[in-house]
Each structure stands twice: as C-alpha cells, then as structure tokens.
From Swiss-Prot:
InterPro entries: SAM-dependent_MTases_sf, UbiG_MeTrfase. It comes from Rickettsia typhi (strain ATCC VR-144 / Wilmington). Coiled coil: none annotated. Keywords: Methyltransferase, S-adenosyl-L-methionine, Transferase, Ubiquinone biosynthesis. Its EC number is 2.1.1.222, 2.1.1.64. It catalyses: a 3-demethylubiquinol + S-adenosyl-L-methionine = a ubiquinol + S-adenosyl-L-homocysteine + H(+); a 3-(all-trans-polyprenyl)benzene-1,2-diol + S-adenosyl-L-methionine = a 2-methoxy-6-(all-trans-polyprenyl)phenol + S-adenosyl-L-homocysteine + H(+). S-adenosyl-L-methionine binds at R36, G60, D81, L123. Pfam families: Methyltransf_23 (PF13489). Transmembrane segments: none annotated. This is Ubiquinone biosynthesis O-methyltransferase.
Length: 246
C-alpha cells in the first residue's frame, strides 16, 4: 500500500530546486531549522551514551535540510525521498559542502525491511502522505530495538486551521497557498491509537509556537498547532532474556 500522494509530489516537484533558498517557498523551514536540529540532537544524547556510530534515517528528506546539518556534525545519515528532483537538490548541496550522506530516491515502503536504524526522523511529512496509518507503521518498523524516532506534524484543531492555513498561507505567506490540507492534519491521539499494538512508546510531546512579540519560534508545551513526537522502541521480554544468557 503506497503512501505516495501524486498531487503532493507534483506540488513539491515544482519548487524542489528551491530548498536552500532561505527567502523562497521553504523559508519557514529555514527559520525553524535550528530548533528542529537542536531538539533531535538533544533527544539523541538523552537516549544514547555513545553517539559516535549511530545510524540515522531521515524519511521524506526533501532537499536535505535535516540530513545536511546532522551529517555536518558527524552523524551517519541515510536520507530518502520519493522525488528524484529533491534527491538531486540534496545531493548537489551535500557535494558542494563536502558532506557524506547516503541519499536514496525511494519510499519507506520500498526500503528493505531488514534495514534498521538507531534514529528514525520524519519531519513535516506525515500531513502530505496517503494511507497515514500504514506509513507510520512502516516508519517505526525501521527502528532498531531500543532505538528512537522523532516525528513532527500539525495537529487537527481549529487553532491549527487558523494559524497553519489561514495565517501561514493566506495572510503572512510563510508557505505557498494550498500547501496544507486540514483533513490531513493528525491529532497526537490518532498517532497513539495507530501505535497501540506495537512496541513503540510515546516518550514526549512538544509544541513549536511562534512568539509574535519577539518574532521568533520556540519550543512549548502548547501542541495545538505544530508538534514534535519523541518515540522509543521497547525491547520485548524475550529479547531481554536472550541477551541476558551468558
């Protein structure tokens, strides 16, 4: 079952050359990117004592806005995207900046099942895919036992409709009009329900809000609009028993 939304792909293909233009269609992502990177690294360091050999998977990597900064800090990153033009843009940037990133034009469904990662990242992607339940299940399938995942998306609330669509797209023009579809926004409780029968636990929910007075973005406990979800993959009791055998 494919997660690809062809309409969404066409929309992003038109602007895929512009990922690294801080004043372009992805400008808002550049403005929040330092927060996203800091949050990811904070959770990685919180969970792992040794981060030197971690394998990271960035799903729906776009032009490499997450993969590149992580690679620049020494992380081993594999980044995938369904769009060839996104991978081309990301690869060109990596080559220009002497970054080693394993970019692949593929989808989470097509990724080999036995490819497991210490950290799986999927930011601002879920609200653009089809078959979201299967997409999320495929996503967490690639987390190593005792590994973690960090995802972000937009809550389906009246406040999110107001700020995520009306204000962001039509008043302030932070993103192009029709970037988002309110019906595809996802409540945290819906993700929790999808993960109910898995060995994935939600470790933290954290909001990302815009402070109008200071003209800056910051992390918050307000998850009514944008939010991060920090996930952990539990090791089952059988695995623990096997690993404890001398």
């Amino acid at each position: 079952m494919s997660s690809i939304n062809k309409k969404e792909l066409k929309k992003f293909e038109k602007i895929s050359h512009n990922w690294w233009n801080k004043d372009g269609e992805f400008g808002i992502l550049h403005r929040i990117n330092h927060i996203r990177i800091e949050y990811i690294i904070e959770k990685i360091k919180l969970h792992y004592n040794d981060i030197s050999k971690l394998q990271i998977l960035d799903v729906g990597c776009g032009g490499g806005l997450i993969a590149a900064p992580l690679a620049s800090q020494g992380f081993n990153v594999t980044a995938i995207d369904a769009l060839k033009s996104n991978i081309e843009t990301a690869t060109i940037y990596a080559q220009k900046n002497d970054l080693k990133i394993n970019y692949l034009q593929t989808t989470i469904e097509e990724l080999e099942n036995d490819k497991l990662y210490d950290v799986v990242i999927c930011l601002e992607v879920i609200e653009h895919v089809e078959n979201v339940q299967q997409f999320i299940l495929n996503l967490v399938q690639h987390i190593k036992p005792n590994g973690i995942a960090i995802i972000s998306t937009i809550n389906r609330t009246k406040k999110a409709y107001l700020f995520g669509i009306i204000v962001a797209e039509y008043i302030l023009g932070w993103v192009p009009k029709n970037t988002h579809d309110y019906s595809k926004f996802l409540k945290p409780s819906e993700i929790y329900e999808i993960l109910t029968d898995t060995n994935i636990e939600i470790k933290e929910l954290k909001g990302l809000v815009f402070n109008l007075a200071r003209n800056e973005w910051k992390l918050s406990n307000d998850i009514d609009v944008n939010y991060f979800m920090y996930l952990g993959k539990k090791i089952n009791s059988l695995s623990n028993a096997i690993n404890s055998i001398p």
